[in-house]
């Protein structure tokens, strides 16, 4: 995170020093305008939609630590794609370490009207995902959302499993789900996942929580 902050402050300083101030504005207003514009540049100046331009089903894989909100995000994303984008969506849980995650996703799928591919803790994540892909093709689904297992911390076994799963199903989008209250460790966690997977986007959850969290 430090390189990003350094680049940001350098850009603000470069633009702010020596900038002419219009008569209708004061220096503070001009500075805030520059900061706002640079923040937009860092965070992204436009909303980017999910890339679903592939032969159906477009596979979207979720990755992140346990408790970040991956399963809930899958439900919300399924609802968004169905209602806003008019897509036929199927969801599947490849989390064989937390059986409750499978039931949770089934409940969410029923609530939002998405297709649900059943799985059990006895199966292998790759077999689950491949079975879901076949089912999604047979059912003419546009999108398949794949929920994955998380851990309390980043470890080699977790990264190895998720790398193998990614290689097996080749998702068009791989989204990193992170808790907004993770704090400074979020950058390290994101780097670890990005080193293991070609992440295409980030989902920030619980951003309406305690502002002191992170």
Where in this protein do the model-derived segments appear?
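Conserved catalytic-core segment of NTP-binding enzymes
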Residues: 124-138, 151-214
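Conserved D-loop-proximal element of ABC-family nucleotide-binding domains
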Residues: 99-102, 154-156
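Primarily NTPase-proximal linker/entry elements flanking Walker-type ATP/GTP-binding cores
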Residues: 1-94, 101-122, 129-146
